[in-house]
Amino acid sequence: MFMINIISLIIPILLAVAFLTLVERKVLGYMQLRKGPNIVGPYGLLQPIADAVKLFTKEPLRPLTSSTTMFIMAPILALTLALTMWVPLPMPYPLINMNLGVLFMLAMSSLAVYSILWSGWASNSKYALIGALRAVAQTISYEVTLAIILLSVLLMNGSFTLSTLIITQEHLWLIFPAWPLAMMWFISTLAETNRAPFDLTEGESELVSGFNVEYAAGPFAMFFLAEYANIIMMNIFTTLLFFGAFHNPYMPELYVVNFTVKTLALTILFLWIRASYPRFRYDQLMHLLWKNFLPLTLALCMWHVTLPIISASIPPQT
């Protein structure tokens, strides 16, 4: 029975990821005053299926000098971790209701760094290695602010359980009292998922395509799926933290619709940002984090800790 539950979570995620690629190409197309894919199937709806078939039927080439085991393990690990992070998400009921769901997701996103590092190192190519090192430095750096922002939000929530965030936001979305945090959180999620304008790892002019430059066919598709699954997952996380969807136990369908619409809006915003902004320079990226975001988030975290104490009460504990 548990296996059926897992499969019923994984298959919709993979389908969502497949069609997100189509949405991205369509949105970018219309933003550049062109149509986007519209040949394969009605309105190009079968394009993701054609892409998947094309990728998985190609020969998985491997460089002679690469480390075989690690080279194959890296994309598998990336996809596994990307799918594992969906387990504690309440939609409205999680697959596994964890007490420390937020901590679990933070730990999983930190582990994803290893798959990038392994892929860059195992490829035995200098482009891949430079791309991987950039990606790792960027991901680790932005995780610092993500963790501090999470801590500040959870002080208002009172526990590390994701389900309590829904109850906390029944009357007021947390984006209103914590809008500076929400702003920094959103920019940090862009950097965390290696999206434009922070897609330094894929600097085409200097690194071809970053850490996955030596990958082809199936393993490349796995990295691709992992990246897009992480994008949707981060947007779901943002929705849970700041745009709490109202949950009526008698009508869970309403929650699902509410939740999906907010997640979709954030995902379209990701694509809109990609179409609008040029890529950052590497030093600007690091400067933004260590000199701007980190002091601000630390100050706001202290503010969130001291405010309840000043007003003669302790933070909520559930």
From Swiss-Prot:
Keywords: Electron transport, Membrane, Mitochondrion, Mitochondrion inner membrane, NAD, Respiratory chain, Translocase, Transmembrane, Transmembrane helix, Transport, Ubiquinone
Substrates-to-products reaction catalysed: a ubiquinone + NADH + 5 H(+)(in) = a ubiquinol + NAD(+) + 4 H(+)(out)
GO cellular component, one term: mitochondrial inner membrane
Intracellular or extracellular location(s): Mitochondrion inner membrane
Top-rank taxon, per record: Eukaryota
One Pfam match: NADHdh
GO molecular function: NADH dehydrogenase (ubiquinone) activity
UniProt xrefs under InterPro entries: NADH_UbQ_OxRdtase_su1/FPO, NADH_UbQ_OxRdtase_su1_CS
EC number: 7.1.1.2
GO terms under biological process: mitochondrial electron transport, NADH to ubiquinone; mitochondrial respiratory chain complex I assembly
Parts of the chain that traverse the membrane: 2-22, 70-90, 100-120, 147-167, 171-191, 223-243, 253-273, 294-314
Membrane topology classification: Multi-pass membrane protein
Role of this protein: Core subunit of the mitochondrial membrane respiratory chain NADH dehydrogenase (Complex I) which catalyzes electron transfer from NADH through the respiratory chain, using ubiquinone as an electron acceptor. Essential for the catalytic activity and assembly of complex I.
Recorded family membership: Belongs to the complex I subunit 1 family.
Summary of subunit composition and partner proteins: Core subunit of respiratory chain NADH dehydrogenase (Complex I) which is composed of 45 different subunits.
PANTHER family in UniProt: NADH DEHYDROGENASE SUBUNIT 1 (PTHR11432), NADH-UBIQUINONE OXIDOREDUCTASE CHAIN 1 (PTHR11432:SF3)
Name of this chain's protein: NADH-ubiquinone oxidoreductase chain 1
Encoding gene per record: MT-ND1
